[in-house]
Structures are given as C-alpha cells and as structure tokens.
A protein has these predicted regions:
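Alpha-helical support elements that line or immediately flank enzyme active sites
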Residues: 56-58, 281-286, 496-505, 638
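Feature 926 captures the class I aminoacyl-tRNA synthetase adenylation module centered on the KMSKS loop
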Residues: 202, 395-455, 459, 503-546, ...
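Non-catalytic terminal extensions that flank enzyme cores
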Residues: 1-54, 77, 335, 348, ...
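Secondary-structure transition/capping motifs at alpha-helix termini
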Residues: 68-76, 97-110, 130, 134-139, ...
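Active-site-adjacent "gating/activation" loops or surface patches in catalytic cores
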Residues: 253-259, 448-478, 644, 648-651
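Short, solvent-exposed turn/loop segments enriched in Gly/Ser/Thr/Pro and often Arg
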Residues: 34-36, 44-45, 78-91, 144-152, ...
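N-terminal catalytic cores of NTP/NDP-binding nucleotidyl/phosphoryl-transfer enzymes
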Residues: 31-94, 147, 156, 216-219, ...
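Residue patterns forming the tRNA-binding/recognition surfaces of aminoacyl-tRNA synthetases
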Residues: 3, 17, 21-25, 95-214, ...
Length: 886
C-alpha cells in the first residue's frame, strides 16, 4: 500500500537520511559475480588540495547517472572512487601553511615534511569524500583508493622498474619547464599561458668579415648570452648568400654561425631568429638538427650563472635584462624597442614565470609505447564521445615527445633508483641492493626525485583493481567500460592511461572515453579565483538540494561542449522537483488503500492508453539516448513528458473519473492504476538524474520494494503502443488549447461555462473525442463537449477554432455578457486614448527628445506603438460587439 508524502519537498530533511540508507545497505558495493555482466568505471581522482568545484560536480554527476542507469539495467556496476596526491600542488600548499607558522620546509627536513603532508591528506581527502556524498554519488566507498596508498605505490614501483629494464625509462638531459621558485621541473599541464604586454628588442648581430649585420628581434634579450646560432629560412632569398657565415654575438667575444632551418617563419619580423637551445624548446630542436652547443646561462633560481654570465653573473634574470639592454644601447647594438603582446608561461601554483632549461631528468621513451594507443582508435578498440576528439587524441600521440617523469620535490612516489656511494653505479629495483654489482660497495643513496603525478594516475584503471597482482577483481572488472573526463586532460591523463594499459596489461583500460566540457559562468567566462566568479556547488546544494544542482548541470548538456551556469536554471530545477513531488502527492492521496487491478477494456479509455503509450515511447527514447551518451537530451525528454504530458495533461484528465468513482468505479480504477504505473516508470527514468527526490517518492509509492535504485530499468513493450489513442488525445489537446486561447483573448472567466461543438467527419476520431468529454468540461470550463459531423444547430455568430481534422465552435452568447463587455472595452478605449495623448505629447516635445537618454526616448516610442496596437484591437472588438447587438 502507498504512503502519503509530506506536504512540501524538503531536500535537507531527506538527502542525508537516504544516502546513509544506501550506504548501510551496500547498494553501491560490487563484488565479483560471474552470473552478471560487469560495468566498471573509475572516478578521475580529485586532487587533495582543496574543495570540489563545479567542474568536479559535473564530472561526477555524469558518472553517477551512467552507473545508476547500468545498475538498474542489471549490470554488476562498479564505480571506484579515490583521490590524487597532486604532488607539486599539495607540496606548495603545505609549504605555504608551514610559512604561515614560521617554519622553513628545508629546516624541517624531508621526513617531518612528509608527516605534515600526510596529515593534510587525511584532512582534505575526508572533506572531498563528504562533498561527493552530498552530491549523491553512488560509488563503492569500500573500494576508495589514493594514488599513494600501498597498492598504488606497489604498482608505480613495478611499472618504473619494468619500463627501466625494458629500456623505456632513461635519465638524460633535455629541455624542460623549470620553476625557479619551487625549483622543480614542470609539465605543460602545470604551466598557465597568459597574454602579457612586453617588448621586441631589435638587436644588431654583426656579420663577421663584413660591415653588414643581421637585425634580430627578441622578447628575451637576457638569453642572448646563451645564443649559439642565427637561423634563417632555407628559401629566403635575402639570406641565401650568408648561410654558413658567422655573426659576432653582442656583449661577448663569441662568434656564432648562421644556419638555414625550416622552423623559421620568413614572413615574421626580419625573418632571422636567434637560437638559444638551452632556453627555448623550439631552439632546442633546431640545435639538435644542427649540432649546436647548448649553453645554460642560468642557475636554478633564474639568476645568471658564473660560467657564462660575465659581468651579469649573480643578477636575477630581469635585473640582467635591464643591464644588458642598457649595454646594448651604449655599445650601438640596440636598433629599436617595439611594444609587443605575447604569451608568457607561469607556474599554475606559485605564479612564477617558468624558465625553459636543459636539465638532467628521468624520461620515458614514448615512440614505441604510443603505437598501440594509436592503433586502438584506428581499429575501434577505443572510441571517444563525441567522435571529433579522436583527431585530437591522435594528433597528440602522433607528435608525442619523450615524457619527463621526475620532479624535484618531496611529496610523491620516490624514484626507485639507487646510486652506489663508491662508484656511482645506478641500480633500479625494489629497495637498495645488498652490494653494488660493479664495485661491490654496500652503501647506496636513493635518488632524491619523485615521480610526476600523472605517472601514478596513468595506472589508475588497473592499479585500483589489484595490479600487478592477478586478482579476481582485475580479471572480472578490467578492462573498465567508460571513462568520463574533461577535454582539457585528454593529453595529460587519457593518453597516458591508454598506453599504460597496453604496456602493462595488454589491453586498452576502457573502450569508451566520454568527454564533457567546462562549466563556465553565465557570461561564458571560465570560473577562476582571479575573476571571483566561481560558484561553490556545496552552497547550491545547501540552498536548493543536490537534485536541483544535478539537473541544472544536465540541462542542455551536450557531450564535449562547454556549458554556462545560470542560477535561474537551479531555481527551475528545484521547481521541477517540487512539481514531481506535488503530482506524486496528489496521486498517493487518491490511491489511499485502494486495491488496484490492471484495467480491462483499455481501448475504451483513450486518455489512459495515450499516457501509457507516450510513457512507453519515452522509455525507448531515453534508453536510446542514454546508450548514445546524450544524457542532456534524455533528461529533456523526461522533463517534457513529466511536466507537460503527465502533470499538466494526464493528471487533469484523470481527475474526472477519480472524483466520480461512484458513478464509474471501473474508470476510476483504470485512471488510478495508470497514474501509479506511469509514475513508477517516470521515477525510474528520472532516478539517475535526481536520485533523492525520486527515491523518497518511490519508497512511499511502493514501500514493499527494497529501493528504487535497485529496481529494474523500464523496457519498451509493444503491448503499450497505442498510436490511435495518441492521435485522439493529440487532437483533444489542440481543441482544449484552442478553447483556452479564445477564452483568454475574450477575457472570459472560468466561472462562465460554455458549450463547445466539435465538427469532425472522422468517425474514429469523433468517437474517441466523445470519450474525453467529461475531462474537457473541467479543463476548458465547458458545460459540454458536443461531437457532431456537421454544423447543424450551431449559431452563425459562434466563434470558430480550426484544429487538424476538425473545427470547434463556441456560441458567442454563452461566452460573454454583451453589455458588460462593451462597458469594459469603452473604459479601456478611454484609458488608451489618454496614454496615446500623453506619449505623443512627450515625443513631440523637442526638449525631451534631445535631452533625455536615447534608451528612455526609445522606451516611450515602444510604449506608443503598443498602445496604438491595443487601441486598434479594442476598436475592432467594440465594433464587432455593437454590430452583433444591433
């Protein structure tokens, strides 16, 4: 038997209670069950560096919708949650926290610093878990992981050793992003590029043996000390005769060659560029092609070094810039200085300008490892949704460079490389060896560096299932099915997971990558601290409930596209939850303790058949859209059905048989049975999107069932397909809308009933419409809905409404009181006459037109136009009424 709902829906009163019930009953938990097909996804682990933002809310809502959907379809659905140690991000946060306490990180020491960082992790990982629970995510908390937990650390060490032994990992010198403040290498993902105002300094480079010179424009004159060549385009006729000659390097006693390289854009600037291989990634590649020396002019803190700095040694890079520009000008090398805006890379954590430098680091050779990941897209083992991201993925993989995996920080997986204290031999393995294989020494020092965060994250789909051990979980749940993530980390994470999956398990880690966009503010701007436009999802949940936030994030959402966040949409989503609640409450109040039976003679009940048929089609459409990852489209179909067809139409149509059950108990039973069945199916379809409100309603509607989230997903059934009844009710809706429009246009109150005549030659349609006559009386304020084949007996002055396959007539005398309406319209005519005169007076006043703001003048013109249109309608209506009166 159904139970009644509270009068109003209060999210705060039910969300925590329901989530606790779900967890206590282990509804989110999955174990190996060979009788079921698994569906697995892993949560992109949020960093432990703070609170969740709106992007996390979107990402996890999408995942939760999919996992709830698959669970209801009968899959053994596993969603693995976890957090990322976020190496450098966390280290910066903890370092700053220590600074506020007056503690220096280096004085504290590595071990004590790591203790503090683990404390940070415990605090913030718990905060993130609590926030995710408030969102309603149904991940398996019994399997929660951390990228530095024992199992993940074991996998990381195993992979490093394996790749090293196979020759893929090596230590070498290459150009990398370097942070002079944090004193560590950085990935491209950790570098933010922003447009900054700067200058082009045009400098003379004298050509040796001539009186001529090359004019070079640079935004970084301080790197001149590291120049080892001037490059020009091979096809540039201006410079063909000087390729191979030497230039004098200003401010030094060195000479550098002029080389030809296709890297140069001959249309940009002077067509000649300085090459500084140790301080620019593009120059580094040019240098490799031409065997140029690599001169590093900077120390780790971005001061100029002693070896190549000369008089500028010890200066900060910007201090050196000023000094060098002054010397260039004094010595006649500076041609001109031109303002120029250009992109500058800064560390996303400490906001220091990043310095490209050649450093000895640990790298992964990528060319061979990338090949299976490329082939996966081409042979269909892996796909992106939307498909357009296939090209982006392939472009990055086909142009991939060796991957720098070492970081000069303490928080992270320490590199398992050990150096012999006697001879320097490098040994990579599980712990330090007993003795050096080269010299026999028994003393070793472990490499100080840690691994890049993404190195461990790349193993996430299989390390979380027990790899490198061949566990039952790994055998059953891996490969996973879908990865949900943003397009901004395809290169930094997705690609690395794919090649890691092939390298270590022989399989792609997932078969589908479902890409979503960014959540932007209402103006389309990226949410950021600097703009102050971030929106805290927890504040939205606190005010409107989790379901309202989830629905807002899905409204209009399309795979791969950015979305704008509007507070108005949150209110609309909350209103929808209230609408569903109130409709459900009405239904349950009328169900009471009635024993309902599946109705017989359904063909005699077009309204019941129509809504069952519409609901059946909805099940099919939603399922198809869910399977195509068109989650936003699926939600819009559910919304339209529940708000419009079910609440606004069917419930209103069902009221007559419910309220007149004594006259026709069979019709009342049919209406109530249909209401309950359609509500049950609708709640199931809506549940993945709005789990809390649907679960609460369902638990009261069918208290004998265990839980909505554990119920079966609805399926399309041919027996509930009623195209004839759909056609009848579609016509009925047009008739009701037409009558309502006429009543509104003529200002007829609902208290004034009328008779509507429907002239319809189609017998089947007419018969069906006749069965809906009682419903029409309430929905269109009618005395009666009369169906006939011709116009006989209908007054000549009746208002006609043309609808498909029929015409509706409303006798005018039943709609209005002529005297009363003429009096009302006469008063309206007088009012409009005054308004038109007032408006004309203002617009004919030259002072108003010339001195008032343009917007104010235009506003008055718009008012006048509206008044004139209204006056024309009033006059036309008055003339018509007076003519009928006479």
């Amino acid at each position: 038997m159904s139970e009644n709902l509270e009068k109003t829906y209060n999210p705060k009163a039910i969300e925590a209670k329901l989530y606790e019930k779900w967890c206590d009953n282990k509804y989110f938990h999955a174990e190996v069950d060979r009788s079921k097909k698994p569906f697995t996804t892993v949560m992109p682990p949020p960093n432990i560096t703070g609170k969740l933002h709106m992007g996390h809310a979107l990402d996890n809502t999408l995942q939760d919708i999919l996992i709830r959907y698959k669970r209801m379809q009968g899959y053994n659905a596993l969603w693995i949650p976890g957090t990322d140690h976020a190496a450098i991000s966390t280290e910066v946060k903890v370092t700053n926290q220590l600074k506020e306490e007056g503690i220096d990180k280096k004085e504290l020491g590595r071990e004590k610093f790591l203790e503090r960082t683990w404390q940070w992790k415990e605090e913030y990982a718990g905060t993130i878990e609590g926030q995710l629970k408030k969102l309603g995510v149904s991940c398996d908390w019994d399997r929660e992981r951390f990228t530095m937990d024992e199992g993940c650390s074991k996998a990381v060490e195993e992979v490093f050793i394996k790749l090293y032994n196979e020759g893929y990992i090596y230590k070498g010198s290459r150009i990398i992003n370097w942070c002079p403040v944090c004193k560590t290498s950085l990935s491209d993902a950790e570098v933010e590029h922003e447009e900054q105002d700067g200058f082009f300094w045009h400098i003379k480079y004298p050509i040796v043996g001539t009186d001529d010179y090359l004019e070079i424009a640079t935004t970084r004159p301080e790197t001149l000390l590291g120049d080892t060549a001037i490059a020009v385009h091979p096809d540039d006729e201006r410079y063909k005769d000087i390729v191979g000659k030497m230039c004098k390097l200003p401010l030094t006693d060195r000479e550098i060659p002029i080389v030809a390289d296709y890297y140069v854009d001959k249309e940009f600037g002077t067509g000649a560029v300085k090459i500084t291989p140790a301080h620019d990634p593009n120059d580094f590649e040019v240098g490799k092609r031409h065997n140029l020396p690599e001169i590093n002019i900077m120390n780790d803190d971005a001061t100029i070094n002693e070896q190549y700095g000369g008089k500028y040694a010890g200066m900060d890079r910007y201090e050196a810039r000023k000094a060098m520009v002054a010397d260039l000008e004094e010595q006649g090398y500076l041609v001109k200085v031109v303002p120029h805006s250009h992109n500058v890379g800064t560390h996303d954590r400490c906001h220091t300008t990043v310095e490209p430098m050649i450093k000895q680091q640990w790298f992964v050779k990528m060319e061979e490892l990338a090949k299976p990941a490329i082939e996966a897209i081409k042979n269909g083992d892996l796909r992106f949704v939307p498909e357009r991201f296939n090209k982006i993925y392939l472009h990055w993989l086909e142009n991939i460079r060796d991957w720098c995996i070492s970081r000069q920080i303490w928080w992270g997986h320490r590199i398992p490389a050990y150096y012999c204290d006697e001879c320097g031999e490098v040994v990579v393995g599980h712990g330090a060896p007993e003795k050096c294989p080269k010299c026999g020494c028994t003393h070793f020092t472990q490499d100080e560096d840690t691994l890049y965060t993404w190195f461990s994250s790349a193993l996430w789909p299989f390390s979380t299932l027990g790899w490198p051990d061949q566990t039952e979980d790994l055998d059953y749940f891996y490969p996973t099915d879908v990865l949900v993530t943003g397009y901004d980390i395809i290169f930094f994470w997705v690609i690395r997971m794919v090649f890691s999956g092939y390298a270590h398990t022989g399989k792609a880690p997932f078969h589908t990558v479902f890409i979503h966009g960014l959540v932007r503010d209402s103006q389309g701007r990226k949410m950021s601290k600097s703009l102050g436009n971030g929106i805290d999802p927890l504040e939205i949940i606190d005010q409107y409930g989790a379901d309202a936030l989830r629905m807002t994030l899905m409204t209009g959402n399309a795979p791969g596209n950015d979305m704008r966040f509007y507070n108005e949409r949150v209110e609309a989503s909350r209103n929808f939850a209230n609408k569903v609640w109130n409709a459900s409450r009405f239904i349950m109040m009328n169900l009471d303790e009635k024993e309902l039976k599946k109705p017989a003679n359904f063909e005699k009940r077009p309204a019941d058949c129509w809504i069952m048929s519409k609901c059946n089609s909805l099940v099919k459409d939603v399922t198809e859209n869910m399977d195509k990852f068109e989650l936003g489209i699926a939600l819009s179909k559910i919304y339209d059905f529940m708000w419009d067809e079910f609440c606004d139409w069917y419930i209103e149509m069902a009221k007559y048989p419910i309220y007149h059950a004594d006259e026709d108990p069979e019709a009342a039973n049919a209406a109530l049975w249909t209401l309950r069945e359609v509500l049950k199916k609708s709640l199931k379809l809506l549940h993945p999107y709005m789990p809390f409100v649907t679960e609460e309603i369902y638990s009261k509607l069918v208290p004998e069932e265990e839980s909505l989230m554990m119920s079966d997903w609805p399926v399309y059934e041919e027996e509930w397909n009623f195209p004839v009844d759909e056609n009848i009710v579609d016509h009925y809706k047009e008739i009701i809308r037409g009558i309502r429009n006429v009543r509104a246009e003529m200002n007829v109150p609902n208290s004034r009933k009328a008779t509507a005549f429907v002239v319809c030659e189609d017998e089947e349609l007419g018969a069906g419409l006749a069965l809906l006559g009682h419903a029409a009386q309430n929905m269109a304020a009618l005395n009666e809905l009369v169906i006939q084949k011709d116009k006989s007996g209908i007054a000549d002055d009746a208002v006609s409404i043309v609808v498909p396959d029929a015409t509706v007539y409303l006798p005018l005398e039943e709609l209005i009181d002529f005297e009363q309406e003429i009096e009302r319209l006469t008063k309206e005519e007088a009012r409009l006459t005054k308004e038109i005169a007032r408006s004309n007076g203002m617009l004919n006043n030259e002072k108003f037109v010339s001195k008032a703001p343009a917007a104010k003048v235009q506003e008055e013109r718009d008012k006048l136009e509206t008044y004139q249109q209204m006056m024309a309608q009033v006059k036309e209506r008055l003339e018509g009424l007076k003519a009928k009166q006479s």
